[in-house]
Amino acid sequence: KRQHGSEAYRGSRKGRKSDTVIGVGDVLTKRLEQKNIKVVHDRNIYDVKNGKEERSKAYNYAATAIEKNLKKYPSIQVVIDLHRDGVNESTKLVTRQNGKRMAQIMFFNGLSRTTKTGDIEYLYNPYIVDNLAISFQMQLKAAEYYPGFTRRIYLKGYRYNMHYCPKTLLIEVGAQTNTLAEAKNCLLYTSPSPRDM
């Protein structure tokens, strides 16, 4: 798993990785390991370089680490890229599941094409259909067990490093309007996993 490490939540303490999407990744790691799924959790920050936020280059910085991890651990079957969405301050992405307030999640897919320009040749991705399939399967499974837990699947024109593995999930866990507890709860108290697919 990798993430935009500086993405934080309402009430997050500045400078603490555990209060950002990295801390949410820690919860997901623990949850998957409880299901006997081996996890390589990349806790590095790719959207800040030399103390300066550089979100536009984060995917380039992360690509090297993804390649390195896939080479080092060739048995990796699923790549999960965690993010936190940015929404209007009045937008609340909260649901209640298992008696807990939790952030809604959104599966995000890069298509390497736009309706205006067609295929983006330099962003070739042989796994577009595979990635869409796992997002759709996860969305259906979540809707079956936890109605209202997921938002719509978001489709965007670029690639988002989804070309390295046929099962890549880019997941937006809540938004800046969610508390850290809501973000962590959504992965702590729900159970569909990529193994279910």
Regions found by a protein language model. Name each.
Residues 1-76, 85-91:
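N-terminal catalytic or cofactor-binding beta/alpha core of small enzyme domains
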Residues 28, 138, 190:
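Aromatic/hydrophobic pocket-lining residues that form π-stacking "cages" and hydrophobic walls in ligand
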Residues 189-197:
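Single conserved hydrophobic/aromatic residue that forms the stacking wall/gate
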Residues 59-64, 70-74, 78, 84-185:
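Active-site-proximal helix/loop segments of hydrolytic enzymes
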